[in-house]
Amino acid sequence: MVQFNGPHGKVTVSYLRQGGLNPPAPAPKGSFTGKTVLITGCSSGIGYQAALQIASLNPKRLILGTRTLAKGEAAKQEILATVGPSLDSSIIEVIPIECSDLSSVRQFTTTVRKTTPPGTLDCVLLSAGLALPTREVVTDESGHEWPTTFVVNVLAPALLALEFLPLLQSTPGSVVESVNSISYCNVTSEDISPLLSSQDEATGTTSALDFFNNPERWTTQRAYYEAKLMLMFVLEGLVQDQAQQQASQPGEDRKVLFLACCPGQCRTNLYRQFGLGVRAFMTLFNAVIARTAEQGARTLVTGLLLQGEEAMGKMWVNDRFDDWSPGITEEEWKVLQKRVWEEIKGVLGKA
């Protein structure tokens, strides 16, 4: 869980620069021997680099969830060529998933469950992410419109974790890791004060999801930071719900390790859909400040190897658990986390 007595304030350039100068350590050889690992968002960037590293660490099975079959097959062939003849091509399986479409996410989980016996899904790495220069929307299964970035960055990983939960609970030592960012700490009490002080006449409260996704307050940066905050709320909700389930079934030990990781500022194609000016600036900025995608992916990979209560609900960054404190108070966090998590489960039909 997050802590509220650590360093405060928005994440600085100097913090990012230190990460670039001090990349994390790679995972030990053979780390995934006998394990089945599933990764989403792995056709390029950090997700691809994580898949490549895991493929070289002797997994039993590696499932690549990519937007299209063609992108996934291209990634598979590149991984096979890079790792070399020691990697059997049958180990890698490609299954398409469009994370902006919740019905596609459900179909993906159905396909995986059909081909994955109970007790054999060891690691799930949720690395699909999206940044857009403008507010685009998609319609969910109930007809409600949401920003595409919110669906990809928050709803899809939440749904994946919930859909895979029974399969993960049947696998001893299973891990679900979501790729996040400590930039969730950039959301401040001032940013959320309108939500906490407003009420709907009918229900007594205002929808937190509608507030965060209001087109009148949408900016690329705000949407990114707040999506990361909501993803932390999802993480805490998964941990708390599991604890409640364990308490009601004391004789069963079916605990899944849920955690987040932050790869740091990395040189990727995240801003590929932005204008030339933004892309040029980020290229220069990343050249000076950032890690390579390969270095950032090390954090994703080593995070999957963590075990124990010490890691539960934590964020793994720079080879340690993050100690940065949120930009909102502990009381604000408790209120918002509960509201956001319950609303997300309602949207996903998991309430």
Swiss-Prot record:
Q: Name one GO molecular function term.
A: oxidoreductase activity
UniProt-listed GO biological process terms: antibiotic biosynthetic process
Its EC number(s):
1.1.1.-
**InterPro entries in UniProt:** NAD(P)-bd_dom_sf (IPR036291), SDR_fam (IPR002347)
Which residues of this UniProt protein bind NADP(+)?
A: I46, T66, E98, Y224, K228, T268
Q: Where is the active site?
A: Y224 (proton donor), K228 (lowers pka of active site tyr)
Q: In which pathway does it act?
A: Antibiotic biosynthesis
Q: Which family does it belong to?
A: Belongs to the short-chain dehydrogenases/reductases (SDR) family.
What task does this protein carry out?
A: Short-chain dehydrogenase; part of the gene cluster that mediates the biosynthesis of sordarin and hypoxysordarin, glycoside antibiotics with a unique tetracyclic diterpene aglycone structure. First, the geranylgeranyl diphosphate synthase sdnC constructs GGDP from farnesyl diphosphate and isopentenyl diphosphate. The diterpene cyclase sdnA then catalyzes the cyclization of GGDP to afford cycloaraneosene.
Recorded protein name is Short-chain dehydrogenase sdnK
Species of origin reads Sordaria araneosa (Pleurage araneosa)
Chain's gene name: sdnK
